[in-house]
């Protein structure tokens, strides 16, 4: 079996940013998260990085994955996305580190074709390479192939794919592997003499936070907190207003207000104008997570007329 065929068999195809499982999930609602997206894209498109790693963190439902999916899509369109991996706790192949390096190497071979022969040679030299440690795999399948082509004329160091995007690291099923992946990615960036960079998102779990607090990872990373750095209320308001507008345009209500409508009104101390509605629906949490949004939208669908 050829080296690239062996590699393909080790790839977690459903973890790619443009796989059906990932790309079908919500991205940032148009006009929301503008400041965060602008910040990440401006950082990613720079020609040099003071800190080559950004850790995007926040609690469940704060929008980390939607932001990562959107950024991956935008960078892919600009030809800057090198590789991505979207972990998911219940997704086969996406919930462990077993296929992580192979999946990254596969994408590198596709977006920088000059690396493919070197990756294939590494697999041919050691057909058991995928049973080695993650670091040994990274050296053979990521670092060495990139180093081998640095002096080739086709490798433009200013206009080339150079951003890794990793999402949901906390959903990897082995906490030790979570920290191992962080260490490996940091070492990969240190071994490459030209600028490459990483945006990684996770919940601020104890082990992950600890890894960012010390050592080389602390020195080469910056942090972007979704629960402190950015006020999400305007984004929530825009999302709700747009969704309410869609419902109003597409599905006129029957008799107003109707019993269920009265039930919704009863949640508010006064008629549900935008400000009071917003306050009543999100005052239980600093962040209005996606679960709450789903519940709200499902309830609103029951208010629509039939037929």
Segments from the language model and where they lie:
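Conserved NB-ARC/NACHT P-loop NTPase core of NLR-like innate immune receptors
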Residues: 1-307
């Amino acid at each position: 079996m050829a080296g690239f065929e062996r590699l393909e068999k080790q790839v977690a195809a459903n973890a790619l940013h443009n796989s059906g499982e990932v790309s079908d999930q919500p991205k940032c609602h148009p006009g929301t998260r503008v400041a965060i997206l602008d910040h990440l894209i401006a950082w990613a498109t720079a020609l040099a990085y003071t800190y080559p790693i950004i850790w995007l963190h926040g609690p469940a439902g704060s929008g980390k994955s939607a932001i990562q999916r959107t950024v991956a899509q935008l960078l892919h369109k600009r030809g800057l996305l090198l590789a991505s991996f979207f972990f998911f706790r219940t997704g086969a192949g996406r919930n462990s580190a077993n296929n992580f390096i192979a999946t990254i190497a596969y994408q590198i071979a596709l977006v920088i074709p000059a690396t493919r022969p070197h990756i294939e040679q590494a697999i041919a030299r050691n057909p058991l390479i995928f049973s080695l440690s993650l670091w040994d795999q990274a050296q053979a399948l990521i670092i060495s192939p990139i180093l081998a082509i640095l002096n080739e004329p086709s490798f433009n160091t200013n206009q080339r794919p150079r951003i890794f995007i990793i999402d949901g690291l906390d959903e990897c099923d082995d906490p030790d592997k979570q920290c191992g992946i962080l260490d490996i990615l940091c070492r990969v960036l240190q071994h490459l003499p030209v600028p490459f960079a990483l945006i990684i998102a996770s919940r601020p779990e104890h082990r992950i936070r600890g890894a960012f607090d010390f050592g080389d990872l602390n020195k080469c990373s910056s942090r972007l907190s979704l629960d402190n750095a950015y006020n999400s209320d305007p984004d929530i308001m825009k999302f709700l207003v747009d969704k309410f507008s869609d419902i109003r345009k597409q599905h006129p209500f029957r008799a107003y207000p109707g019993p269920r409508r009265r039930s919704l009104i009863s949640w508010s101390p006064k008629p549900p104008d935008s400000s009071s509605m917003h306050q009543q629906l999100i005052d239980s949490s600093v962040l209005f997570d996606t679960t709450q949004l789903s519940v709200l939208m499902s309830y609103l669908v029951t208010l629509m007329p039939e037929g």
